[in-house]
Amino acid sequence: MSLDAMFVAGLKDELSRALEGARIDKIHQPERDEIVLAVRGAKAPGRLLISANPGKARVCGLDGMRENPPNAPMFCMLLRKHLTGGRIRRVSQPGLERILDFEIDVMDELGLPAKKTLTAELMGRHSNIILRDGKNMIIDALKRIDIAMSEKRQVLPGLIYDLPPKQNKLSPFDYKRADIFEMLCGAKKDESVEKWLLDTFFGVSPLICREIAYRAAGDTTIGIRGLSDSERERVAAEAENIFTAVKSGGFKPCILYDGDKPADFSFVPITQYGGLYRLKVYEDMSCLLRDFYDIRDEKDRLQKKARDVMKTVNTAYERANRKLELQRQELADARNREEI
């Protein structure tokens, strides 16, 4: 899915407007890798889901109730101790990372004002939820990462929180059309436009890189060698248009439907698939994420039920066939009973 850093930038803007000043009333952990905050405020969504599930990491408003375990997990109890009654001061995105920081004003054990930060790292299989104190020290994390798991970055109680290691890429917000055109002219000719964009700029997903190539040259797989000068200009222009839209908050989130099943989503309308996918545009990203994963989960549940029913039917069919074969054999043996 396309929960890239640019999508997270739009989500951050949206959550900032909705959550700043909201009070955290309750905290639940319905799943091993999901936290639900009950938040109260003028624009707050009521319940906020923070998921570190590797396949569907996200932060969004939540419709309906989730079934909670009879006994709250230890991490949930820790969050309740530190964050219940706190007010969300600020929602931020460090750099252009797939990370959201929720800065929360709370009262400490002595009744004095303090600051805690709840961090949602939305990075696929590296997704995590981390609680920090006002000195940037990790209080605890949903997934503890020790040196045996990662030599580059550990996430453990008592350690100072560090951002994930930087990639050797450029910020898309620092370069204009002329700069992008000049870099493109000096790029390796045997690379595709998609790969060059992906390797050059930080925070851009493969879907968006292909979209830029398609808008510029009508081909998602076109190589740099095959570009005319005018097409190079268009690649630079389309890249600048998308980067500028993100910087200025010009998001137009949409879901791509394959029939009635959500296939992908983006922060800008996607044109590269033509009429193959149906496009549904949303007003806000939180609703998009909620619908995308709710619909997919429901369809996955239905497919699982269908598979379970088919397995039961096939098992019963095979059992009946075996019984029928035994009865046929008994009948054949019975025909010779007079001779015996």
Regions found by a protein language model. Give the residues of each.
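Extended, highly charged segments
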Residues: 1-340
